[in-house]
Amino acid sequence: MDLRLIFGPTCTGKTSTAIALAQQTGLPVLSLDRVQCCPQLSTGSGRPTVEELKGTTRLYLDDRPLVKGIIAAEQAHERLIAEVYNYEAHGGLILEGGSISLLKCMAQSGYWSADFRWHIIRHKLADEETFMKAAKARVKQMLCPAIGPSLIQELVYLWNEPRLRPILKEIDGYRYAMLFASQNRITPDMLLQLDADMEGKLIHGIAQEYLIHARRQEHEFPPVSAAAFEGFEGPPFGAY
């Protein structure tokens, strides 16, 4: 079975690469993103819209309400193995994402060492200026999407249920928006009415939070196997 793995830090274009590859191959894309398993966080987690998918198929490891929390890495890994098994007859899958913990689970599991032909695309972290430009563009789109609720609208809706707030504080984007509101002594719903200057500061802050996370991803991702080449067989990751 062919597995095409696309991974790298946030805001480096993995989803676009996966969609383009899905168009070329006709294979479905399975998201290796634990936060994207919560549809209530669709915009803030970077779930592509139906239009952005361009007729391709995108699968998720779970479909759960936020009240259940973010799926644990070990459970997500079990779901990943099950989905790969389910699609074995289709001849292949595209795996795309940047969950450090899930990729580490893959690296530590012997399951991936046999019976697969690997095609790996590793997106690297660019310099800070290039990254921030891309991250700010992404945040602007999240704050004013063409379709669906904005990141702030998702936050405001979920904020109304106090038991969800600790979960939101653990998620990039939502966490900074909550901090920004607190620092400026406003309620989350007032984030929907910011002037251009304040919105610019919010965008910059969220992008900076993404940069911090991207640097952590770049540092903690398991390394690609030294034996990696197009269509190689064996473990996809090396020792770390």
UniProtKB/Swiss-Prot annotation:
GO terms for molecular function: AMP dimethylallyltransferase activity. The keyword Signal does not apply. GO terms for biological process: cytokinin biosynthetic process. Its EC number is 2.5.1.27. InterPro entries: P-loop_NTPase (IPR027417), Tzs (IPR002648). It catalyses: dimethylallyl diphosphate + AMP = N(6)-(dimethylallyl)adenosine 5'-phosphate + diphosphate. Pfam families: IPT (PF01745). It comes from the Bacteria. Keywords: Crown gall tumor, Cytokinin biosynthesis, Plasmid, Transferase. Belongs to the isopentenyl transferase family. Transfers dimethylallyl groups to AMP as part of the biosynthesis of cytokinin phytohormones. This is Adenylate dimethylallyltransferase. It comes from Agrobacterium vitis (Rhizobium vitis).
